Amino acid sequence: MINLIRTNSENKGFIDLVKLLDAELAALDGDEHVFYAQLNKTDTIKHVIVAYENDTPISCGAIREYSPTTMEVKRMYTLPGHRGKGIATKVLNELEKWASELSYQKCILETGWRQPDAIRLYEKNGYSRIPNYGKYAGIANSVCFEKEITG
């Protein structure tokens, strides 16, 4: 059984999963990883979801405020052996629910062109592509999305 918990970036399960995520992204991004790493600091994230299976952390995601009306989805990751089972969708849905409870109106996010599974996840969950925003503007490997979460 999958159990989702709301926590923050000090959660050990989240920290362990993010280390695995960073290693995977370093292999995918190559020389560009240094640029992306500076945008993915996790030390002050207040809103984190960790999915556990039998007390083992298997998936995570986070949101942080981008603007007074918008949360940015960050650090989405699922262990390779647990992918394709809908766990990331559950984490994403819980993040959106949390953002809505906090009175935010939409979520935005950035992922990489080298991550087709992530792109499919966001598209199948109702995210629409938008021009690259903020520090991702002009970055060829980035693809950005948004989704209205109130309605």
Place the predicted regions along the sequence by residue.
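Conserved catalytic-core motifs of GNAT/GCN5-like acyltransferases
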Residues: S9, H33, I108-W113, I119, ...
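Alpha-helical interaction/dimerization surfaces of two-component signaling modules
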Residues: L17, L21-E24, W98, L121, ...
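Conserved phosphate-binding and hydrolysis motifs of nucleotide-dependent enzymes
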Residues: D55, S59, G86-A88, G126
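Acetyl-CoA-dependent GNAT
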Residues: I2-K74, L79-P80, L92-N93, N132-K135, ...
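Conserved acetyl-CoA-binding loop-helix of GNAT-fold acetyltransferases
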Residues: T78, G84-K97, K124
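Short coil/turn segments at alpha/beta junctions that flank glycine-rich nucleotide-binding fingerprints
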Residues: T69, K85, E101-Q105
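Conserved GNAT acetyl-CoA-binding A-motif
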Residues: L92, A99-T111
